[in-house]
Amino acid sequence: MSTSVAGVLAVALLVAALWVTYRPFGDYMYRVFAAKRHLRVERAIYRLTGVNPDTGQRWPVYARSVLAFSLVSVLLLYLLQRVQEHLPLNLGFGAVGPALAWNTAVSFMTNTNWQAYSGESTMGHTVQMTGLAVQNFVSAAVGIAVAIAVVRGFARRRAPVAVGGPGGPNGPGGPGGPNGPGAGSRDDVIGTGDELGNFWVDLTRTVIRILLPVCVIAAIVLVAGGAIQNLHGNRVVSTLAGGHQTITGGPVASQEAIKEFGTNGGGFYNVNSAHPFENPTSWTNLVEIFLLLAIAFSLPRTFGRMVGDRRQGLAIVAVMAVLALGSFAVNAAFQTAHHGTVPVAVGAATEGTDTRFGVPNSALFASATTLTSTGAVNSFHDSYTSLGGATLLFNMMLGEVAPGGTGSGLYGMLVLAVVTVFVAGLMIGRTPEYLGKKIGSREIKFASLYFLATPAIALLGTGVAMGLPGERASMLNSGAHGLSEVLYAFTSAANNNGSAFGGISVNTTWYNTALGLAMLFGRLLPMLLVLGMAGSFARQHPVPATAGTLPTHRPQFAGMLGAIALIIVALTFFPALALGPLAEGIH
């Protein structure tokens, strides 16, 4: 079977698997956050931490909880790295330096997993298991929790009548009451106040009911495929050529599962998913791609269930799918364009790819990992053709909404939907409404700042790095490609992706500090802004739909939504792209 046929087959299987799981997995996540009962282990956690799980939080309280948990996570992971030499299973590694420890702590807390170090030669098993792997779970859970809180903001109904009374929405004769048509289906789940839920409950449920069960199964599947899972240290073995090689073992499969499923991306080994201990075969490669896309492509179904209109979720996921498939097609085309002597001879640009996967499956993995916030790699992105690499860069510049990271993809797409409805409202001269909520100046300010925050961080960081002579010395390439590498690094950090072009010596005090700040603000600023927007929507009374209301579930709206996403990227990043990968491609 040729690699092209294998690539087409892999895409077909992947699309089929995602479509089959879209409904059941999306419905399952809906039931997780709709459930009134708490599991016994959850109640124990709430008692231990002093959390009242039945108390709702308005958006400022929810946001403060996110900030507090995130900053404590950074501190604990930083301290764990700094005392590594005193920990068991440290494999003889000493304490991680202050700048690198800061960068790594922020990286894993923000779900970025940017790695300025080689995992097998820097981190011992204790730090890997109790620090990095734990953050892989909770950072993904934070993103999902924020997404669910944002959806609640759109779905909330403020009702002045007494809840539970005869005429109230949950009373005996009310629409959500036991005898009403809604019979406990929606108001019981969403509520009628302006609270966005309880962050600690959302976080706990996400980890225990969603991430842990799937990752246990996924780890077993990966072990069956050849991924390793042990507590071995470094072993020196004799090679066939008569030399010696050091092989590092460790709890790889368990970390690989959450690395992909939580769209984290940080590898146990320096070469990430190109290492045969992490990603042994072509079918485990497909399993890993499925894992990193599963949550992001199923959350729109959860969204549709929560807002009471499943068609809204279908419209969102359709835009995600079209953008994702288009990106893969363009990237694969650029990688097989046959420009140059070697690509013509072998049929594709194979530098930096693994022969186990070939160009199509490498391009598929690269597209999936940059369209989400994963950042894992099974090929060397810096070796892609200039326009192939530009496609990966463009994927991150989209804000990773096609489908995006765990949670961040959904709430990013919802902010895009708000902007799209606002633009459409301006064109027809009506007050814009989305899901029964009016979009006023307050909401559009939050949305505008959301789309300005990440590009500003990425472009400012790139500009400063290019302007400092000392930091330019860290670049191993000059010209357009050198600019592309720096732009890629800060775009990856600001968008919490974590993949890299390489070509830069980033384990320096300046780069560790600057990229750490880019990751921190790139994660927390958009979260705070989108929670503020959700809180503003939650305070509103729903507006009944009229003949002039824009239908947001139809193909016309989906087309506008995709166009707005592309236009925002083009207007924001085109000058930088023109100076970097586009200039290199034309040359």
Curated annotation (Swiss-Prot):
GO terms for cellular component: plasma membrane. Belongs to the KdpA family. It comes from Frankia alni (strain DSM 45986 / CECT 9034 / ACN14a). Keywords: Cell membrane, Ion transport, Membrane, Potassium, Potassium transport, Transmembrane, Transmembrane helix, Transport. Part of the high-affinity ATP-driven potassium transport (or Kdp) system, which catalyzes the hydrolysis of ATP coupled with the electrogenic transport of potassium into the cytoplasm. This subunit binds the extracellular potassium ions and delivers the ions to the membrane domain of KdpB through an intramembrane tunnel. InterPro entries: KdpA. Residues 162-188 are annotated as: Disordered. It is found in: Cell membrane. Residues 164-183 have a biased composition (Gly residues). This is Potassium-transporting ATPase potassium-binding subunit. PANTHER family: POTASSIUM-TRANSPORTING ATPASE A CHAIN (PTHR30607), POTASSIUM-TRANSPORTING ATPASE POTASSIUM-BINDING SUBUNIT (PTHR30607:SF2). It comes from the Bacteria. The chain crosses the membrane at residues 1-21, 60-80, 89-109, 131-151, 208-228, 280-300, 314-334, 409-429, 449-469, 514-534, 557-577. It holds the Pfam family KdpA. GO terms for molecular function: P-type potassium transmembrane transporter activity; potassium ion binding. It is a multi-pass membrane protein. The system is composed of three essential subunits: KdpA, KdpB and KdpC.
